[in-house]
Amino acid sequence: MHSLVMTVIGPDRPGLVEELSATVAAHHGNWLESRMSRLAGHFAGLLRVECPEEESTRLLEALQGLRDLSVSISREITTECERPRKISFEVVGNDRPGIVQELSSAIVRAGGNVEELVSDLESAPHAGHQVFRATGSVAVATDFDDAGLVTALEALGPDLAVSLEE
């Protein structure tokens, strides 16, 4: 079996996920995992599928031939797990340019690796402006200092509320 990781982006439309999944199934593929979202009128997806070796070329061609979609495909890279522990985080505060870069830099400096990140702007109740919210997961070593990560994230500004959960 070949394991493939792909990104898919294009104008959102009804039936798009069904079309993708039908294409995978038609080539005897197994949809293993995915993350999908609608952003600014576009469908954006990241997915991992397995298919028989003899079907992989035809599957790739079929996916790349889908209407109005840009598909980028890579073979799965298997690596040893160097960071066996995951920590979930949430950061909420005033939005500003560069906040995602600051957040990701603080996580790296503290010794973590961002594995998942979802960010959004939300209306702040009674404030009349938007607030930034990020949630995600960080892979860390077994002996990782959780308090050090909280300190690094809180140092980004007094307006940020930070929470971690194992």
Which residues are covered by each model-predicted region?
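A conserved regulatory-domain signal marking ACT and ACT-like small-molecule sensing domains
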Residues: M1-E166
